[in-house]
Amino acid sequence: MKIQYLGLCSKKMKKYSYIFYYFLLLVSCENTDKQNTIDIDLSKTDSCIAYSMFVKSVENLDLHITDGLPITGVERLYFDESKIFVKDSGREGILVFDKGSGNLLKRVNPFGEGPEEIKRISSFCLDTYHKKICIFDQSDMKVKMYDFSGKYACSYPTDMFFIDMAKLDKNSMTYFYPIYAEEQFYGIWSSDSLNQLKKQVSSHVTKECMFHYFPMLYNMNDTCVYYYDRNWDEISVVTSDSIQTLYSLGVKQRIPLFKKGIRDITPQELDGYAILPNFDCSNNFILCSFHTFDKNDIRKKNITWVLLDTRTGKVTISKKLKNDLMAEDEIENNSLFYMNNYTWLRVDDSFEDLIRLKILHLQ
């Protein structure tokens, strides 16, 4: 868990008091003209959220790791038609696997000081238009491109810092920086390969937004992403030139805005407040995990799951996410990844010689 404090906040968060009448998730990138507010109280929990409430079936896919490759954990997962791209949470770079067999095809790990090498992978995404792996190397402020076989292709400099990026258009890149900054763009914008601004997509960032909790949160869905904005606890659809809010989450235990930018904030000041590490969207469901801070151990994993059935409006909250469709040991981590609107994934990376993907085929 990484927490970054980037300034002082002084304004209290806006409190939502709207009455929620119905739920409707419009998952099409072209049809997102409704906004709903969902009230969530993480203290009101049920015994469990069972897979059978939102999953049709579970399938295992083992990704086979070469002997001696010390994987720390899975930080990112991306897919194309035939390959799976895994970002290691340590220093092992990006691993490329065959989507059918799970065999390791390539390890993209060109760490070094040369112009074609990487000093630090600050973020990465796939360019499915040109079949490229895009890596932002913060150390020399360049976006470096590698083909799907791991061979260096090209790079371009950027004078704008960003937290994450997504390739949503053939001729531009979309960047995310949800932190207030006086000397550069903030919010969401798109630029071409010459670093020329094409569109300021969103500037919904105020001077109080000086706090960020890693990692960034979006579900990649072809020409759009489903984006979770932790400043306002909003789920939106973002394209290369537009943004539309789908839901606002009125989490009772959310961190007040005035606390988020306090430097050297103490565990006592965060005690009992919650923030969202992961979420997934689909045609019929949204699944979120919330981490609640403990004053006695700020790094303690204290996860509460929230499942929203967008067809009925039912919200289920529980400390336990249970696989009742398959007899197996429960996954110890709180991983949650998005493949598409019909498929989510959890990851068991506790094995030495493989990464086991739990493929959740949704209702």
Report residues per predicted region:
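Conserved blade-ending motifs and adjacent loop-strand segments that build the rim/top face
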Residues: 250-265, 312-338
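Short coil/turn segments at the loop-to-beta-strand junctions that recur within blades
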Residues: 67, 109-116, 158-164, 203-209, ...
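Residue-level detector of Asp-centered blade-edge/turn motifs that repeat once per structural unit
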Residues: 79-81, 126-130, 168-171, 220-222, ...
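Blade-loop segments of beta-propeller domains
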Residues: 65-68, 103-130
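A short helix->beta-strand "capping" segment at the edge of beta-propeller domains
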Residues: 44-71
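Repeated scaffold domains used in trafficking and secretory/extracellular systems
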Residues: 73-76, 119-124, 160-168, 209-217, ...
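Loop/turn-rich, solvent-exposed surfaces of beta-rich toroidal or solenoidal domains
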Residues: 269-316
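Bacterial signal peptide processing site
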Residues: 30-32
